[in-house]
Amino acid sequence: MAAPLLHTRLPGDAAASPSAVKMLGASRTGISNMRALENDFFNSPPRKTVQFGGTVTEVLLKYKTGETNDFELLKNQLLDPDIKDDQIINWLLEFRSSIMYLTKDFEQLISIILRLPWLNRSQTVVEEYLAFLGNLVSAQTVFLRPCLSMIASHFVPPRVIIKEGDVDVSDSDDEDDNLPANFDTSQSLANNSKICTIECYVHNLLRISVYFPTLRHEILELIIEKLLKLDVNASRQGIEDAEETANQTCGGTDSTEGLCNMGFAEAFLEPLWKKLQDPSNPAIIRQAAGNYIGSFLARAKFIPLMIREQRHSAMLLSMDHFTQPAKLCSTPLFLDTSSF
């Protein structure tokens, strides 16, 4: 809207009325406000261009051709410690429009953007920054890990730096004093976890191995490692109490008990047996698989006798195959398992 016209009173004119004086003051206030807005407009960077001219897209394309001057200016402006909210918004708008050009070649530029002080800014800056992160990880997935690391870093309390003059005396060395207590607390929480929590943990890991067979080996290693740690940290009295409770609650002659035990034993032994028989596996893997099979067959009381005989027969046939390659045994051998 244009400002109202102001007329200067000549000596021969009549004196201005009070209402006219009031209107004149309001008009002068409006002109002052417009001049302030005009100054802010010229002092702030434009919304769709960078401060040194051109666009971010042009700067990125020039950088790929070897012209690095504008690119260095761009980095310096982003590293300005006194950067304003409006400037951050302008930069983010520019980068969002150039998201397809921000490839892995501009990893250094992305690291500078991720260090921008955006969290304690205005709500507009926060929303614009989050929108930029969403566009970035959607179009350039190579930057997903740095973005997640940056977001996670804001959940960590800042380190306390103790200074004497210009010398850093300590960089939060006192934080290490709590490490033993924190470790003991975490260990006690893990050891005192409810049985149902551990069962759900193992069950979900095994379900993941069904959906991702390529991760089955690593998942089984993880499960065995965690179970061994629980077994080592468990007290003897706790183990005896758990076994006694299991005998009291799970005893009986349920018709489905044998079928469930048979399915579990087969599911556990079959992958190990394949590992043992595969000559392409390293010797240490095959040896470990054999050790697990032997330990399982010798110590698991719930394994049906039929499975024991089948596995012993298969192992004897395999041993005969390795010791006498020219004379394969044609009839299955059975081991007397009455002593087990």
Curated annotation (Swiss-Prot):
Pfam families assigned: RRN3
GO biological process per UniProt: transcription initiation at RNA polymerase I promoter
GO cellular component: nucleus
Gene Ontology MF terms in the entry: RNA polymerase I core binding; RNA polymerase I general transcription initiation factor activity
Record InterPro entries: RNA_pol_I_trans_ini_fac_RRN3
Family: Belongs to the RRN3 family.
Descriptive protein name: Putative RRN3-like protein RRN3P2
Origin species: Homo sapiens (Human)
Gene name tied to this protein: RRN3P2
